[in-house]
Amino acid sequence: MMLPTIVEWSEPDQKILLEPYTYLGINTDKELPAMVTRAFNHWYQVPQPALDIILKIVGPIHVASLLIDDIQDDSDLRKGKPVAHTVYGVAQTINTATYVFFDAYRNISKLTPFLKSPEITDLGSIIDDEIMALHRGQGKDLYWRDSLICPTEEEYLRMIHNKTGAMFRLPIKLLQALSPVESLPDCFPLVNIIGILAQIQNDLLSLSREFTEDKGFCEDFSEGKFSFPIIHAIKADSSNSLLMDILRSRPKDEATKRKALRYMNDQTKSLDHAFKVIRKLEKIAKEEIEKLGGNPELSSIFELIHFSSTPEIDDQ
């Protein structure tokens, strides 16, 4: 028997392997983590070549995590089209997501020439720490969902500090390690606020009419997910089991989901509550930006994602 000779991994092979990833068609440069990273470089002044490498690490990891999220949430849509695992299968999608994680990780060695901080010699540990945080947060989220345990708002905020915050802290920690600026500002209170703000905004949007085209109608109910406004509604009246019963049944029909949405909007005012928390977080974030000396690009991002009012819902 003739053993195969060792050959280089070819471009056609790579293209096939990455199909579930490229299928999503996500422009990572326009995703919020990348936008925030570029804006924070106003303070860190990392050279453009190093910034580009950081974005090549963070962008793919972000998209790979979405591939896994869609499987774990049993989602139907992502960006308005069928999720990758319904097209390519669960096994291939998991394999692709894992491959993308490791492929992105390999870029970390390209940052070594730009290292400025003598205290940091292992950039890989930055990625390790935040990927661990992401999985810890996701683990809590899945545990609550599958055990039908409603967390408190405080517990939920701690969870998203890990799960969502990781994708914002990771690139900022890399910027910090590579920054030539001698007296660096402490940007991490602001980074953490942005992570929490982004998740609560997403939670509120997922119940809105605007989100239906991208992810389907009120998919958090179908996924049995304890989002920020859903948690508020459950805790607002623990004697009413409506939402817990609906989350347990994971409904697909719009009538049941509209019933839950009307209850949250009219009875517990949970959408208004989430909106007020968002406004409060926006105010705190803007104050932090001013403390750090201002940042026009970051301020522009806040204007872009700002909610002027509670998003319109479709509860009729």
From Swiss-Prot:
Class of this enzyme = lyase
Question: Is Phosphoprotein set as a keyword in this record?
Answer: no
Residues that coordinate or bind Mg(2+) 1: D69, D73
For this protein, what does the record note about how its cofactor is bound? Binds 2 Mg(2+) ions per subunit.
Q: Which GO terms describe its biological process?
A: isoprenoid biosynthetic process
Q: What is its EC number?
A: 4.2.3.-
InterPro entries in the record: Isoprenoid_synthase_dom_sf (IPR008949), Polyprenyl_synt (IPR000092)
* UniProt-annotated binding residues for Mg(2+) 2: D69, D73
Q: Which keywords describe this protein according to UniProt?
A: Lyase, Magnesium, Metal-binding
Coiled coil spans:
none
Needed cofactors: Mg(2+)
Gene3D superfamilies to which the protein is assigned, alphabetical: Farnesyl Diphosphate Synthase
**Catalytic activity annotation:** (2E)-geranyl diphosphate + H2O = linalool + diphosphate; (2E,6E)-farnesyl diphosphate + H2O = (6E)-nerolidol + diphosphate
Q: Name one GO molecular function term.
A: prenyltransferase activity
CDD domains, from UniProt? Trans_IPPS
Q: What does this protein do?
A: Terpene synthase that shows monoterpene synthase activity and produces linalool, using geranyl diphosphate (GPP) as substrate. Also shows sesquiterpene synthase activity as it is able to convert farnesyl diphosphate (FPP) into (E)-nerolidol.
What more the UniProt record tells us is: IDS-like terpene synthases originate from a geranylgeranyl diphosphate synthase (GGDPS) progenitor in fungi, after the split of Melampsora from other genera within the class of pucciniomycetes. They lack coupling activity and act as classical terpene synthases.
Q: Which family does it belong to?
A: Belongs to the FPP/GGPP synthase family.
| PANTHER family xref list | GERANYLGERANYL PYROPHOSPHATE SYNTHASE
Q: What is this protein called?
A: IDS-like terpene synthase 2
Annotated source species = Melampsora larici-populina (strain 98AG31 / pathotype 3-4-7)
Q: What is the lineage of its organism?
A: Eukaryota, Fungi, Dikarya, Basidiomycota, Pucciniomycotina
